[in-house]
Swiss-Prot record:
GO biological process: endocytic recycling; protein transport
Subunit structure: Component of the endosome-associated retrograde protein (EARP) complex, composed of VPS51, VPS52, VPS53 and VPS50/Syndetin. The EARP complex interacts with EIPR1. Interacts with VPS51 and VPS53 in an EIPR1-independent manner.
Note: Was named 'syndetin' after the Greek 'syndeo', which means 'connect' or 'tether'.
Role summary: Acts as a component of the EARP complex that is involved in endocytic recycling. The EARP complex associates with Rab4-positive endosomes and promotes recycling of internalized transferrin receptor (TFRC) to the plasma membrane. Within the EARP complex, required to tether the complex to recycling endosomes. Not involved in retrograde transport from early and late endosomes to the trans-Golgi network (TGN).
N-acetylmethionine modified-residue sites: 1
Subcellular location as annotated: Recycling endosome; Membrane
Gene: VPS50
Descriptive protein name: Syndetin
InterPro entries found in the cross-reference section: Syndetin_C, VPS50, VPS54_N
The keyword Coiled coil is annotated on this UniProt entry: yes
Amino acid sequence: MQKIKSLMTRQGLKSPQESLSDLGAIESLRVPGKEEFRELREQPSDPQAEQELINSIEQVYFSVDSFDIVKYELEKLPPVLNLQELEAYRDKLKQQQAAVSKKVADLILEKQPAYVKELERVTSLQTGLQLAAVICTNGRRHLNIAKEGFTQASLGLLANQRKRQLLIGLLKSLRTIKTLQRTDVRLSEMLEEEDYPGAIQLCLECQKAASTFKHYSCISELNSKLQDTLEQIEEQLDVALSKICKNFDINHYTKVQQAYRLLGKTQTAMDQLHMHFTQAIHNTVFQVVLGYVELCAGNTDTKFQKLQYKDLCTHVTPDSYIPCLADLCKALWEVMLSYYRTMEWHEKHDNEDTASASEGSNMIGTEETNFDRGYIKKKLEHGLTRIWQDVQLKVKTYLLGTDLSIFKYDDFIFVLDIISRLMQVGEEFCGSKSEVLQESIRKQSVNYFKNYHRTRLDELRMFLENETWELCPVKSNFSILQLHEFKFMEQSRSPSVSPSKQPVSTSSKTVTLFEQYCSGGNPFEIQANHKDEETEDVLASNGYESDEQEKSAYQEYDSDSDVPEELKRDYVDEQTGDGPVKSVSRETLKSRKKSDYSLNKVNAPILTNTTLNVIRLVGKYMQMMNILKPIAFDVIHFMSQLFDYYLYAIYTFFGRNDSLESTGLGLSSSRLRTTLNRIQESLIDLEVSADPTATLTAAEERKEKVPSPHLSHLVVLTSGDTLYGLAERVVATESLVFLAEQFEFLQPHLDAVMPAVKKPFLQQFYSQTVSTASELRKPIYWIVAGKALDYEQMLLLMANVKWDVKEIMSQHNIYVDALLKEFEQFNRRLNEVSKRVRIPLPVSNILWEHCIRLANRTIVEGYANVKKCSNEGRALMQLDFQQFLMKLEKLTDIRPIPDKEFVETYIKAYYLTENDMERWIKEHREYSTKQLTNLVNVCLGSHINKKARQKLLAAIDDIDRPKR
């Protein structure tokens, strides 16, 4: 394009812009005419040759418009000019020029219509511009006319109006500043009214207004004053926040939170709140303990105020220890309740804020609120554990500040109950197991309980040695749950029962302490005399609660209210001053013996005063175990020792007889023998009487053992009229069985608190010890059965009978009648004893079974003493035994008769042949060697020869050899 322009320039042509600027030159612009174009086009041409000419033109000719062609060509001339060469070169240039001109002419001719059209458009544009110039000229003329129309007065009026508006705005600003100057009075009033949100709102509005007028010099001082006021409000707000820690008030806390929200410091407020709670715990416990210490000191010495809390706790006296502990827990409860209600407040308002935020559209503000809410929630949840840890440490310090071993049992239980309640609070507060509290009191409890248990074992031994085994007259519907010591079991079944006697909730939902006492009250408001609010009603008014006629006849014995309280306490612990248990005095029992017991009460418990003491002790042990579950195993172990010692005492007093084991009747099972041996090895100190000068080391080794008890000399077991102390034996044995039944009843409760790793001990105790209590009946009542009948006299009568008769007798022998008379006398004596003591059916059956078994074995022994016997004599034996059975079945209801087959089989063995008898001897090893030998000797001569006799005796000797 530049080349074309250059060419046009050289030929005198102008661009369209130049044509517009000088319209006059348009006419003078020479454009090749059609004729010229036609001539150029009509000239014969070779396009290829023309193109080659154009291509042969040097590139420099097409470089820039400022290129000087003449100069370029002149500079190319050689130093020596040659005319022919110059002409040839000139002709070449002309040919090139002609080719270019023709090419340009072709291009111009081709673009001429567009060129003409563009010139027409330019002409039209020029006309429009001329019209616009006329319009502008008219506008300027009218503007000058309007300007000249306004006067100086009008402009002055407008200036005054503007000044008036400015002055009105200034007056308004001055009034606002005046109001701001007086807001400090209103702020003070609002702070006194504890209207913190209103005060902060007002202060912030004042600061905002002051920032609007910051261009006034007086505002800077006002800003400083408002900032000081705001800081003062924050200080008072912090004080108000601290009041929440001890006495939470919803309205008060709502105002405080609204105020902090206005300040945008909700997170800071939560941090401050936790600091205040920590400080409140410290100040509260210190003030409570300090108050009791100063009260007990009896002076106004201020030295205690300078002590550390740990040292201050060591100055609490034993008398004030429990009240101080209760008040300490009350105060700490108030702090934790305030924290609990604080969390409730935030949960409630979080839900409300979430609901309102879901309706709004400010996403940025909602995100900030959610962040603050999440921070506060995490802070509160973390604070639960932190606050409870502080509470535990404070109470632990208090617990360890005093030696609890000097406390009475009830006082110690009271302390444990308070701590247990506190641990329950901790579990509900933050789910903590209160390891700090548990560990701090566990060791003290174990040590205390070991000493207490040792004292109780010695006391139990004294009771057993002074026990006359008389009935303790309790009601027929007696239950251990009626005793004070087991009241806690009824309370524990209802989760809402508390020591402060709150009504039991009928709802099945468990109510927490915080829910129960949220509106008022305190779980540590325990009355010391709470246990005396109810009285026991377990003693029968007359024996076993006989009929109305008996009650009226012996009404003077219906109550023991006239018996001094001192007589009811057979033993007082010299160390603790604690009466062991509530028991009925022996004098009262003697007075009640005058009345007959109602023996029809098949369910009336048989127990003694000592049994009741043991049951009460078990109740106390379970109380401690229920309160302090970590020592459950130790307590249950000590409880098992109480039962072990009672069982061992009953066996020692009434069942120990070495001759029993020689009977071969298996009266004592292997389990019972194992249990007795275990008790003797682990619990009984057999050396205490044999070696009174034992060394200190030996004494320490036997510290956990108890001397074997001795039966009271008042208990007579040698009189035949009383069936050798049958009444005492029944009371003792059945009281043990009753005690075992109570342990069976308590097994689920013990199993529930026993640690899983220790449960095998409990299972073994029940399976090998408690369940063996009823097995003591056999050896104990066997001794009575062995003396109740005169078995030796029967053997003498049987020895006088002639058994080698030659004819069958129709009349039984006299020894049968004598034996039946012995049974009749035994039955009469048994009835006499049953008037004093109810004899349970199992006991009666065992007695009859033992007596019948002994009688039958005595009969076999009598038959084994016979030197000569005929077949008729054997028939007489059968007649005697059948007569005995017939009469005996009228005296007893026991079926089948014990050892009936034992006698019949022995009598029938007389008729066996040699081979049958040999087999019979090997199969019936229940007979003694003497009895088998006599059977063989008596048969000699009748149907057994001497050779067979020797063979049978050898078989008997083979059987007897392993027994030696």
